[in-house]
């Protein structure tokens, strides 16, 4: 089996990298370094948390914040729980945010 044949779904990326190169750096953000193993583990925790909060498949999960490596853990967590991430630009005006949330 080739490396790429193991990646079928977006959520497989964290798992495959976590298995193949667990100690390699996945992200460096400010003073925080996250390995692929940690990235996979953290995204699993996010997915489990979403399920525990009764976020159903295809439910939308809105995220609005400034840049952070944690965003990618949320993206993977949503993929693993089959929910949909909705990134909202933090610079939008309140009516624009309301429009996105109500759409």
Regions found by a protein language model. Give the residues of each.
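N-lobe entry segment of adenylate-forming
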Residues: 1-34, 38-53, 57
